């Protein structure tokens, strides 16, 4: 601490504006068990019809059906059947005679499901100059959109897919104004141009796609009704979980004593649903939402209130995670520390009950790292030091929450094995790329808010200083970084077969929620009103059956 001036160690950081809490409409929610049972029975009755359709479908038709099921949010009902069908397509069908639409659909579905498919399948649509043949492709809107969707699963070195993205973006943008405003095709096209389908949050996209599918003259009424029933079933489950979380949060009474911390259970839970939306992951969602609230309380204590001297005390207490450390802390920090200790004990109890005790020491280790990383950020800010971009990003790998999130969910997924933990400790590219996407999206979205008055640094500030770049140049660079890291994610998604698929999914979904929440300079966690329409759709307004 000797490196800091006397004034700096006792100064409080500039407080970032915390948006007022959204109205609590969930704590008093009571699940209608009779209605939920009706939804469940309706889903089961239709599931057999849908399964029969899936098992009977062949070749191109089965791929279209799988894509429809997944877009409608129904894929989890048929995981085994979908995998069997795709494996057969992967092994037995080369697709040489497929048109553009079907070739791109096959490529995308197989890559989405962790199968390696060469991009050379698109060579047949290229001319001698290495460009896509404009005729007849530019008049095939469905084919162009299918290729556009597929191009976002590219990895490094796949120049044909980069060319596909340029080609399809140009022609789809040109064609879009010519389409009927209310046609399903235009609605899908507009959405895809705004936000690539592969990077969509599945349950949020399902709400959109159900409304689009309902307009489609070729829709299947069985699938449409099942999608609506399934969505409403999930929504009721989400309301129940949000009710439990709201009561847990209100009972803690942290806000009256710690007014500087974020008060957004709803925002935390939105993240949890985005990471794991399926009904069987209720415990996982609850753990994620609580962890986000805990991490936010600790982060805000460092960012918004603690002096350097006080922050050092908190960091040292977190290093030990022992209740006896509480007497070393200022009164307000004791509240935060009790919160951390209480949940740590709950986590340890759950891990023990589930016979996943291996997760406990690694959770504690990640919590210690998180405290050190938050403390480092505070020191940089208060001493007005701008670290190198690389140093800042390395620290951000920890503050992104990717590593601690993995350790927290592992016991709830019965995956807290030494093999899985060792994989995480090796700092795999899948985790680091996810963290970089998270940080870049975060700072692109919240740079203006956090840099108001020039008080709080972001990674953009570090990059601009180090490279002498303008803000616009830096923003452009960050967008390129995000695209590069997504290529890493796409490659690692297929390559990481040493982990259960459900564990690998957290990284892909983490990157998806980062892009969704922070697009258009928004910060959905700090200010949930930015995604209010999405929030109402997920948690408030049921679909009309």
Swiss-Prot record:
Its EC number is 4.2.3.94. Its cofactor is Mg(2+). Pathway: Secondary metabolite biosynthesis; terpenoid biosynthesis. GO terms for biological process: diterpenoid biosynthetic process; farnesyl diphosphate metabolic process; sesquiterpene biosynthetic process. GO terms for cellular component: cytosol. Mg(2+) 2 binds at residues 299, 303. Mg(2+) 1 binds at residues 299, 303. It is an enzyme of class 4 (lyase). Mg(2+) 3 binds at residues 442, 450. It catalyses: (2E,6E)-farnesyl diphosphate = gamma-curcumene + diphosphate. It is found in: Cytoplasm, Cytosol. A motif (DDXXD motif) lies at residues 299-303. It holds the Pfam family Terpene_synth_C. Binds 3 Mg(2+) ions per subunit. Keywords: Cytoplasm, Lyase, Magnesium, Metal-binding. It comes from the Eukaryota. GO terms for molecular function: gamma-curcumene synthase activity; magnesium ion binding; sesquiterpene synthase activity. The Asp-Asp-Xaa-Xaa-Asp/Glu (DDXXD/E) motif is important for the catalytic activity, presumably through binding to Mg(2+). Sesquiterpene synthase involved in gamma-curcumene biosynthesis. Belongs to the terpene synthase family. This is Gamma-curcumene synthase. It comes from Pogostemon cablin (Patchouli). The lineage of its organism: Eukaryota, Viridiplantae, Streptophyta, Embryophyta, Tracheophyta.
């Amino acid at each position: 601490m000797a490196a800091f001036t006397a004034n700096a160690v006792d100064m409080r950081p500039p407080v970032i504006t915390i948006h007022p809490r959204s109205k609590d409409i969930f704590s008093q929610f009571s699940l209608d068990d009779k209605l939920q049972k009706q939804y469940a029975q309706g889903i089961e009755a239709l599931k057999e019809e849908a399964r029969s359709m899936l098992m009977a479908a062949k070749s191109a038709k089965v791929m279209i059906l799988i894509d429809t099921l997944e877009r409608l949010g129904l894929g989890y009902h048929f995981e085994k059947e979908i995998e069997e069908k795709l494996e057969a397509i992967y092994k037995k069908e080369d697709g040489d005679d497929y048109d553009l639409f079907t070739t791109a659909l096959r490529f995308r579905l197989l890559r989405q499901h962790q199968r390696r498919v060469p991009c050379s399948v698109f060579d047949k649509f290229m001319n001698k100059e290495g460009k896509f043949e404009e005729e007849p492709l530019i008049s095939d809107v469905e084919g162009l959109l299918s290729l556009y969707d597929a191009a976002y699963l590219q990895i490094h070195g796949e120049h044909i897919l980069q060319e596909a993205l340029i080609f399809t973006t140009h022609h789809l943008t040109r064609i879009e104004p010519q389409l009927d405003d209310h046609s399903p095709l235009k609605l899908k096209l507009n959405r895809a141009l705004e936000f690539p389908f592969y990077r969509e949050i599945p349950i949020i996209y399902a709400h959109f796609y159900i409304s689009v599918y309902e307009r489609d003259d070729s829709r299947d009424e069985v699938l449409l009704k099942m999608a609506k029933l399934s969505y409403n079933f999930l929504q009721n489950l989400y309301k129940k979980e949000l009710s439990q979380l709201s009561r847990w949060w209100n009972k803690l009474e942290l806000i009256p004593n710690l007014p500087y911390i974020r008060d957004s259970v709803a925002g935390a839970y939105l993240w949890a649903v985005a990471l794991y939306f399926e009904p069987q992951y209720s415990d996982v969602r609850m753990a994620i939402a609580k962890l986000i609230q805990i991490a936010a309380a600790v982060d805000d204590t460092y960012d918004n209130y603690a002096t350097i001297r006080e922050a050092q005390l908190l960091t040292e207490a977190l290093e030990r995670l022992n209740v006896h450390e509480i007497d070393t802390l200022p009164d307000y920090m004791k509240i935060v520390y009790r919160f951390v200790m209480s949940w740590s004990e709950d986590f340890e109890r759950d891990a023990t009950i589930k016979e996943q005790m291996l997760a406990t020491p690694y959770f504690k280790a990640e919590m210690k790292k998180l405290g050190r990383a938050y403390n480092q950020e505070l020191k940089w800010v208060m001493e007005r030091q701008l670290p190198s971009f690389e140093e800042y990003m390395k620290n951000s790998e920890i503050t992104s929450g990717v590593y601690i999130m993995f350790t927290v969910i592992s016991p709830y997924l019965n995956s807290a094995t030494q093999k899985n933990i060792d994989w995480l400790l090796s700092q795999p590219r899948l985790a680091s790329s996810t963290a970089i996407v998270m940080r870049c999206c975060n700072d692109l979205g919240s740079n203006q808010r956090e840099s108001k008055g020039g008080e709080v640094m972001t990674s953009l500030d570090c990059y601009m200083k180090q490279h002498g770049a303008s803000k616009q140049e830096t923003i452009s660079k960050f967008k390129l970084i995000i695209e590069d890291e997504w290529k890493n994610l796409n490659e690692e998604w297929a390559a990481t077969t040493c982990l259960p698929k459900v564990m690998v999914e957290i990284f892909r979904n983490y990157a998806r929620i980062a892009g969704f929440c922070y697009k258009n300079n928004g910060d959905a966690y700090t200010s949930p009103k930015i995604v209010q329409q999405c929030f109402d759709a997920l948690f408030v307004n049921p679909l009309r059956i």
